[in-house]
Amino acid sequence: MNKKLYFPLILFLILVFAFAVQLLRNAQGDDPKALESALIGKPVPLRTLQDLFEEKQYGIEIFQQGKPILLNVWATWCPTCYAEHQYLNKLAQQGVTIIGIDYKDKSAQAIKWLKDLGNPYQIVLKDEKGSNGLDLGVYGAPETFVIDGQGIIHYRHAGDLNQKVWDEKIQPIYQKLVERK
């Protein structure tokens, strides 16, 4: 066989093998969106960040108010964030406390977005450079963290938060934290 054919053939076989491994993981129930987080069971690693609307600065104390919180990392440039936004508004109307981090975004665009689509967040923090997202281990927006009233992370979800994700994954954890309060 010609040496020029070996490299593409080997590359093809590696790709087929990787695809097969992923199919097996999915068949065994592994969620391809599930991302391990070294922060589960640890305090939110929040640096001091500025409020999107005011000159206020916030730190870890906003997560230590004695009640569970959803921390939602989002951006106006993110189409999946747009898809989940209506559901976040619904959760906020139901009394779920949500704090947002506007990730790698321009403040003016974020303010307009929230004005046009509604603001589900009790507080919106700016993370224009993405440094806090990096501390949280964010791979991209949106990501949602379930945090207890002492500021400890209990769950991380990458991707849009919708009814199915809420019912099956996040709400049971959130409800346990509400009852524990």
Curated annotation (Swiss-Prot):
Matches recorded under SUPFAM superfamilies: Thioredoxin-like
Topology term for the membrane: Single-pass membrane protein
Protein known as: Thiol:disulfide interchange protein DsbE
Domain annotation Thioredoxin: ranges: 38-175
Cellular compartment(s): Cell inner membrane
GO molecular-function term, one example from the UniProt record: disulfide oxidoreductase activity
Residues exposed to the Cytoplasmic side: 1-3
Any Pfam family matching the protein: Redoxin
Primary location class: membrane
Keywords associated with the record: Cell inner membrane, Cell membrane, Cytochrome c-type biogenesis, Disulfide bond, Membrane, Redox-active center, Transmembrane, Transmembrane helix
